Amino acid sequence: MCTRGRFQTTCLFLFLLLAGCARFPETGQAVSKRLVVQFRVAGQIRPDYHYFILIDNDNDFLGVNGPVPPIAPPWGGNGFATGSFQYFVEHYSALPFNGFMLYKVLDPDRLQVFQPLGAPLEASVSPDGKSLRVVVDFGSIAREGQDPADIRVLQINVIATDRTPKDPTDTSLKMWDALGDSRQSPNSYLTLQTDADRILRNADTGMEPAGDVVNGNDPDLDIVDWQVEVRS
């Protein structure tokens, strides 16, 4: 089985056929609580760029650790994120399910080893091509043996990048943006309590400026607005 980096397409489809439905209860009972993440870029969501929603579910109420972008080569080993996270959704045109895939990190000490779980509950790009919206149920992001109802807090980040270099000898720059002022505070992420329904918006925090793409000024990577919701 493929274990390093992103699975090759053939391996990915075989895995999904064998195990892609395992994350849903056999009874068909839906998990009531959902995480809804949406964000907008200054330009357009480009199919050849990579857009990530990273989720850290480790009961960290103080928000000590969370998912952050690597700021220099070798780019975290996976090409897009480092820090602490167990799940992520990627949008990229080469992926199945209209370019959306939910992944589970298999080893917290090796963030380049992923297991594809299939499509998010909902995922779409807005008609104007500027916004991306993803919905995942808590059953899909629960830790091994964890009741989804016991998820009380999450750390969340959004990362947009033009490429995901995995070669440790690749020292060339890449463009990226994440939540917060990426040029001044690249280690920003959200800590969201999930014990009740709530909506957190960029307007509530003022943490996301425009024009903060690192190593470039590409509007298609420039995150300018976001909203995160916990919904029952």
Predicted regions and their residues:
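Bacterial N-terminal signal peptides that target proteins for export
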Residues: 1-11
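C-terminal motif of bacterial Sec signal peptides marking the signal peptidase cleavage site
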Residues: 17-20
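Surface-exposed extracytoplasmic segments
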Residues: 22-232
